[in-house]
Amino acid sequence: PLYLGCIVGRYANRIANGQFLLNGKLVKLTQNDNGNHLHGGQKGFSSKLWDVVEHKTNTLILSLESRDQDENYPGTLKTTVSYTINDLNELKVGFHAYSDMDTIINLTQHSYFNLNGNTGEDILNHKIKIDSNQITEIDHQLIPTGKFLDVKGTPLDLRKFTRIGKMINQNFQQINFAKGYDLSLIHI
C-alpha cells in the first residue's frame, strides 16, 4: 500500500519478522509486509480517524488513542500531532506521545509537496536540503540493520541545497536497496 499524506505509526519503517524484544520479553506484532511489520501494521495510524483537538488560522492539532494490544503493541498510547505554519511560512510538524506501559514508538508523516509549482514535471529538478548527518542502514529487504551510516561524501549528503536528479541515480547501495530516497535520514 501507499502511505500518501498520512501520519505513520505506531512504528514507522519495518520490523524484521514482526517481532522485537522489550524488557527481555518477545513481542510479536502483526505481519503485513512479506513476514515483516511495516508502518504500524494492517491497521496502523495511517488508517485511523484522528480527532481534531484544535483548529486555528495557522495551527491544526490532532489526537489519537491507540489501545493496549492494538496491532499487538503493548500499552495504551496517546498521541498528538501539531501542524503549524509560522511567520516565516515554514511548516512545523510536532509529535507528542505518552504510553502507560513500556513500548516502542517511531512516528513520522508522509506529506508530499510539489516544490516548484509545475504539476506536469517530475521531482528530479527539485532542490532539497535536509539537516541530516546520518541514515539508518538497511539491508536488501529494507530492514534496518541497527547501524548508522555517515552521509558525508555520499549521494545522501543533502545538508546543502541539492538537485534531486543529481544524486538519486548514483550507484550507491542504500539508494539501490530503497529504489530512491526511501530511507531514514537522521540528525545526531
Annotate each PLM feature.
Residues N23-K25, D100, D131:
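Short strand-coil-strand connectors
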Residues L26, N32-L88:
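Extended, loop-rich substrate-binding clefts of extracytoplasmic carbohydrate-active enzymes
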Residues I186-I188:
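Conserved small/polar residues in nucleotide/adenosyl-binding loops
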Residues E121-T162:
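A conserved active-site cap/scaffold subdomain adjacent to cofactor or substrate pockets
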Residues D68-G117:
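Acidic, contiguous internal or C-terminal segments within carbohydrate-active enzymes
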Residues T162-A178:
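Contiguous C-terminal substrate-recognition/catalytic subdomains in enzyme active sites
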Residues P1-F45, I143-D157, F177:
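Active-site loop/turn microenvironments that scaffold catalytic and metal-binding pockets
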